[in-house]
Structures are given as C-alpha cells and as structure tokens.
Amino acid sequence: MTMAYENFQNLGSEEKNQEAGKAPPQSFLCNILSWTHLLLFSLGLSLLLLVVISVIGSQNSQLRRDLETLRTTLDNTTSNTKAELQALASRGDSLQTGINSLKVEVDDHGQELQAGRGLSQKVASLESTVEKKEQTLRTDLSEITDRVQQLGKDLKTLTCQLASLKNNGSAVACCPLHWMEHEGSCYWFSQSGKPWPEADKYCQLENSNLVVVNSLAEQNFLQTHMGSVVTWIGLTDQNGPWRWVDGTDYEKGFTHWAPKQPDNWYGHGLGGGEDCAHFTSDGRWNDDVCQRPYRWVCEMKLAKDS
C-alpha cells in the first residue's frame, strides 16, 4: 500500500516536470525568426563587402596598368632622348672636325699666297666654304639646343603626370603634353576648325574650357601664338546676356571688342543673330554665327602650390 502511494506521487511529479519543461510555442517561433533575420543580414553584409572588395580591386588593377603604361612611355622617351643626343653630338663633332680641317687648309694656302698671287681666288673660296660650314654648325647647334629644351619639357611633363597619377589625379599640377603653360594656366591651340558648341564640348572632354581672357597680358599672349587666325573664345550670349563659360563676371571683366561690336548682325543669311565671340585677324573680338567652323583655344587652370 505504501509502495503504491509512492508510485502515484512519483507519477504526478513526472507529469509536472514535463509540463514545466515545455517552451511556449510562440516564443520558439520568435527565436526562429530572429535567427533568420540575423542570417539574412549577415549574408547581405557579406555580399556588400564582396562587391566593395571587387570594385577596389578593379580600380587598383586599372591604376597599376596606367602607372605601368606611363612608366613605359617615360622609359621610351628617356631612351630616345639619349640616342638623339648622342647622334647630334656625333654630328657636331664631325662638323667641327671639318671646320678645323678647312681652317688648316686656309692657313696653308695663306702661306702659299705669299709665294704666289695666283692662289688668292682659292683662298677666298675656301674662306667662303668655312663661313658656310660655320653657319651650318651654328644652325645645327641651335636646333640641338631647341630639341634638348623640348625634350626636357616633355620629360618634366611625364614626370609630373606620373606623380599626379600616383596621387589619384586629385589636382592638375602640370600641363599635359602639347599644352603650353602661361601664368598659372595651360593652353591648347587647335589646328582645325569646329562650330562654337563643338569646340566648347571638345574642351570640356579635356577637363578644360574654351579660353577665358582676363587681361590685356593674356590677350597679347594668345594673339602671339594664334597669329592672324580667326579663333573662338569662351564668350557667348546664346541664353541671354553675354557670359564667360567659366562663370567669370563679364560686366566687371576685361573686354577687347572691335569698334561697333558686338552688333548681333542678322544680314549674314544663315538665320538668327550672332551669339558667339571670336578673335579677328587683328586680335580684336567680334560676335558671329556660332555654327561657323573656326579654330579654338582650350584653357586649363593649374593647381596652386599649397
């Protein structure tokens, strides 16, 4: 009897323990959803990191290729410069040797002249030859000097561009190849003609703008390098009053219009007025139809030293 009572108590205790061990179904479902959200967030974060790493790797790879290309160009330019200098130096030595030889002949024939007047014409001919050789040598030396100076500028430009590329091109510190530096700006002079809008677009694609003339000194510099060729500048009134393409204040700035210009003339027969400015053959400004194919000048500002 006592054992049966104890078994009954044990059975009741086990049922209570089992009921106490059951977790509420709703709490278990919330746990599953929380873990699912956490897993999805982890997967999304992993995918985002993978994309960022791929983009950075692609940019680094492109930068390394650009650096290698520029380094190869620099090496080739340096090698070609050395070869040209050696060839020019050899040519100069040869010319100098020829001149020295001719001078010796002149001296020899000068002594013969003392013994016979019939040699005077030959001496005069030799002196003329020496003079021509010397003139040729001076011309060659001048060409050598100009070439060396240009090669030095090209080498400086390549070195500067390499440094700029290493700094991710954050600022323009030097002019690109075939651009001309003057007073903190780089200038590129076209050799063909385009309508004003196309010329403006071309300069924008080169990270520059159609030239903005800010002073008489800049006007004279541009005119010196353009000569008498009609050339577009970055000044237009297509959308209202006259304005410079870089936002420079036209009303307070420098101008150099020809007499009675701008006149917005309609008698050209091309439709509309004249909304774009250009240099005339004497350097003064004129407004004209924007679709005429004139040459143009691009301008790029250099970064100031910090």
UniProtKB/Swiss-Prot annotation:
Please identify the protein, giving its name as recorded: C-type lectin domain family 10 member A
Residues on the Cytoplasmic side? 1-37
Q: Which PANTHER family match?
A: MANNOSE, PHOSPHOLIPASE, LECTIN RECEPTOR RELATED (PTHR22803)
This chain's source organism reads Rattus norvegicus (Rat)
Q: Which gene encodes it?
A: Clec10a
Q: Which parts pass through the membrane?
A: 38-58
- Keywords, comma-separated and alphabetical: Calcium, Disulfide bond, Glycoprotein, Lectin, Membrane, Signal-anchor, Transmembrane, Transmembrane helix
Example GO biological process term?
A: connective tissue replacement involved in inflammatory response wound healing
Classification via CDD domains: CLECT_DC-SIGN_like
Disulphide bond pairs = C175-C186, C203-C298, C276-C290
